[in-house]
């Protein structure tokens, strides 16, 4: 596991990174100026924007983001995105594949109705240990997402940083969450997103190997570059966003 950079260590010491995470509007204002230097993509590229919680106060922001993506190219399902990577579907321009992490109740109350209104598919990566906890989905809610045509993926059992887990624990988190989801939902679970997701500090090749052995067809990280036909589904690049961010900040994170 690679050590944090000096800048990352200093930000951690000052508490600035956690403060920014607690204040997404400030974070968005900091990211936005760099977006002036980025142009929306005009060439072919597959992007995987993802979100976490979407409280009602940020619903309008999420809708703005999704409409901005749709102006550039289609928002497609996870199946369709993997078909692009494996050569089963052409990539003629910018294309976007939307996902959400953890298991927040706002997915039921805010996100799912919006996606239905816009006709947008999404993948929901579930941390199984959160299901049924206050502020999170129930298993019935997860079944409703499946019934609405969305994809369910695994996000481990307890949301650990996999790099901090021993081999046995990592396998239990990766394979155990898949089994639990399949038992509860009665559907095959084929896609995995690593918590935190930075290959430099949060996960390693061992975890990809464990996911492949468990029967997953895709493994998602938080690397940012666009993907193209021929790239590996076992090393998906996703771009983390917050619905409070202005569109220039989204441009910085997705297209930067």
Where are these regions (language model features)?
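C-terminal active-site subregion of NodB/CE4 polysaccharide deacetylases
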Residues: 1-99, 104-106, 164-256
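Short beta-alpha junction loops
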Residues: 129-131, 225
């Amino acid at each position: 596991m690679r050590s944090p950079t000096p800048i990352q260590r200093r930000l951690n010491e000052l508490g600035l990174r956690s403060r920014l995470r607690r204040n997404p509007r400030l974070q968005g204002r900091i990211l936005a100026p760099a977006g002036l230097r980025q142009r929306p993509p005009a060439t072919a590229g597959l992007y995987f924007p993802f979100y976490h919680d979407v409280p009602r106060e940020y619903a309008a922001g999420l809708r703005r983001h999704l409409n901005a993506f749709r102006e550039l190219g289609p928002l497609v399902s996870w199946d369709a995105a993997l078909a692009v990577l494996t050569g089963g579907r052409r990539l003629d321009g910018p294309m976007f594949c939307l996902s959400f992490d953890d298991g927040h109740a706002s997915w039921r109350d805010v996100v799912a109705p919006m996606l239905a209104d816009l006709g947008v598919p999404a993948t929901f990566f579930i941390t199984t240990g959160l299901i049924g906890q206050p502020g999170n989905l129930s298993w019935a809610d997860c079944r409703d997402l499946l019934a609405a045509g969305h994809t369910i993926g695994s996000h481990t059992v307890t949301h650990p940083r996999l790099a901090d887990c021993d081999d046995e624990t990592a396998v239990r988190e990766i394979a155990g969450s898949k089994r639990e989801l399949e038992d509860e939902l009665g559907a095959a679970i084929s896609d995995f997103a690593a918590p935190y997701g930075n290959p430099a500090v949060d996960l390693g090749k061992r975890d990809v190997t464990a996911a492949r052995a468990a029967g997953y067809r895709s493994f998602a990280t938080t690397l940012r570059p666009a993907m193209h036909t021929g790239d590996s589904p076992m090393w998906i690049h996703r771009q983390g966003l917050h619905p409070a961010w202005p569109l220039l900040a989204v441009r910085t994170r997705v297209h930067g």
